[in-house]
Amino acid sequence: MTRIDAHGLKIAPVLFDFITKEAAPKTGIDPDAFWAGVAAILRDLGSKNRELLKFRDTLQDKIDAWHLANKGKAFDLGAYTAFLKEIGYLLPEPATQKVETANVDDEIGKICGPQLVVPLTNARYALNAANARWGSLYDAFYGTDAIPHDPSEGGKGYNKARGDKVIAKAKAFLDAAAPLATGSHTDVTAYSVIAGQLSAKLKSGNATALKNAGQFAGYQGSAEAPSVILLANNGLHVEVVIDRSHVIGKDDPAGVSDMILEAAVSTILDMEDSVAAVDAEDKVLVYRNTLGLMNGTLSADFEKGGKTLTRALNSDRSYTTPSGGTLALHGRSLLLIRNCGHHMFTDAVLGADGEEIPEGILDAAVTGLLAIHDLKGHSKVKNSRTGSIYIVKPKMHGPDEVALTVELFARVEKMLGLPENTMKVGIMDEERRTTVNLKACIQQASKRIVFINTGFLDRTGDEIHTSMEAGPMIRKNEMKAQPWIKAYEDWNVDMGLIDGLPGHAQIGKGMWAAPDKMADMLAQKIGHPSAGATTAWVPSPTAATLHALHYHQVNVKARQDELTKGGPRAKLGDILTIPVSNSNWAPDDVRQEIDNNCQGILGYVVRWIDQGVGCSKVPDIHDVGLMEDRATLRISSQHLANWLHHGVVSKDQVMDSLKRMAVVVDKQNAGDPLYQPMAPSFDGVAFKAACDLVFEGRTQPNGYTEYILTARRREAKASETAKA
């Protein structure tokens, strides 16, 4: 490939052309000036980026040495804490300073609800997520195990017996979220609007109204026979759809054919953990899809029922208000964009030294450029209505790394002529050093922060790697019951409340990873809003619709007030308690643990390496589909690396399991025409990558999987090109 030279940079032609011909036009930014700005930022911040990465390694070496020096001794939390302070890992907690982030959209500062995460490599998935702001409750109940499936309800077409259960459950939700003054929504035979109030005629012939008249937010159609009733509860909206000609509405006493819930309030468009973007072509695909979302042109064709359908961004929704005015509601999820972390490098651009440049610097510059299309109103639909660009920054270790991000964003703003603090930052609290210094991290970004979020899987991966020399870790499935996990989750909310995030920023919780287990999600994920979180991650638009029910059940703002009055709950000592085990596991337990980890690693890695799929529903060892990305890979590979290092398992045991599980994964993927089996040769690039992740896991910086995955994916792509 012949690269294009610009201001000392050597740029891949596909990226150069994208910036020149697609991204820059209509922004007012000259492409040459853009590259001059990127080059200047790299000159000033590139070395600082590398110094911070070296400091990570220095701290890890010192922590390893401390554990080795104290091997065989009882763990002394006091001595350990003092040591972490001495080496600069644990910093003094700063005085409380409330955040000052301004110009945030309501989806960030006011509305509590679900958050989707979607790979930017897949246009249709990205559009589905952006459009998941509104979702059918009837469909979500009918199509999932949220209502248990009865074998008698099988067959093609609409099953009325199951439909009746769905309607009953949905009406029960409505009775709880927007109750009538008398009676139940089940008893309503007609809704109408009279003198600006919602009137509900009951089977008895009497009319009633809402218990709280203020919950009636608007309607569509005529006042006498509205086609949609809009209700509000805890900041979220519900549409009651009325259509007596519909297959469901014709049998409903009130003609109700569906309930549409405000669901995915926000969505993270991911350039990081859920994508496999290893070269300039991949990066341009990610950037091009981002551009299409920012300027409103993105569309995707797909086949359904023998027809080709086109998906595009939904329009806003319009209603008549109770007073006769017009109400417009956002028709799409507010979009945040997750850039790569400081530790990633890309060959899409080479620096003056011929080396790959920090990928996060390129991401920030390009994201800012692309978002100008939204800020300038080039799309028929707006993302931010307050003039902000929302960027989630992952895998930062401590406040100095947050400070680098803040400086980077300031430089990009200056380069692009954007007002100061236009580029907002979401801080992923997924690394141990960020957790223990979270207050200082927040304060470094006090005028930009719009998001803090816990991520159990990555955070556990860093927990294992940081304390690799402390001893063998407990079994993976026992990790969630450990004291450090609860303390970590509570600490995040505590710090968010202390620093005044409500009204300025989201406080988020992690992913529900089992998209087919919606009954379990309904039972368990209510814990996230109950913990004071304003948002939490879900794996699909359907899951977003169902998780929205929790925000109708829990008034998060009231819960946050309760927590604030109660004071901080988490203790630093619990967070620093290392989850090592003294157990002498039975051979069957060890084999089960190895097999579980190996199967999960192979099931994810084989698609990443061979097909470039960075996030997908991967069957686990029991054939339960789980959403996998690099975070799940990190914990599994680090856990095996830890057990190998401490002699709990041998290399031969792990290799035997990898080969047996490769056969299992091959069978699970037998229906995929693009799949390349790993057995019986076990010499493919994907299998080798899985082996590298385990057997080299202890020496990978912070236990990250990206370096091995990227190298092996590039190898696989080169092999494909050679064959072609």
Curated annotation (Swiss-Prot):
SUPFAM superfamilies, alphabetized: Malate synthase G
GO molecular function: magnesium ion binding; malate synthase activity
EC number: 2.3.3.9
Entry annotation: catalytic residues: R338 (proton acceptor), D629 (proton donor)
One Pfam family this sequence matches: MS_N
Reactions catalysed, as given in the entry: glyoxylate + acetyl-CoA + H2O = (S)-malate + CoA + H(+)
Main location (coarse class): cytoplasm
GO cellular component, one term: cytosol
Domain of life of the native organism: Bacteria
Residues with PTM Cysteine sulfenic acid (-SOH): C615
Binding site for acetyl-CoA: V117, R124, Y125, S274, R311, P539
Residues at which glyoxylate binds: R338, E430, G455, F456, L457, D458
Record InterPro entries: Malate_synth_C_sf, Malate_synth_sf, Malate_synthase_TIM, Malate_synthG, MS_C, MS_N, MS_N_TIM-barrel_dom, MSG_insertion
Biological processes per GO annotation: glyoxylate catabolic process; glyoxylate cycle; tricarboxylic acid cycle
Compartment(s) where it occurs, according to its Swiss-Prot or TrEMBL record: Cytoplasm
Keywords noted in UniProt: Cytoplasm, Glyoxylate bypass, Magnesium, Metal-binding, Oxidation, Transferase, Tricarboxylic acid cycle
Cofactor dependency: Mg(2+)
Function per UniProt: Involved in the glycolate utilization. Catalyzes the condensation and subsequent hydrolysis of acetyl-coenzyme A (acetyl-CoA) and glyoxylate to form malate and CoA.
Self-association state and partner proteins as the record states: Monomer.
NCBIfam families given in the database record: malate_syn_G, PRK02999.1
Listed name of the protein: Malate synthase G
Organism: Bradyrhizobium sp. (strain ORS 278)
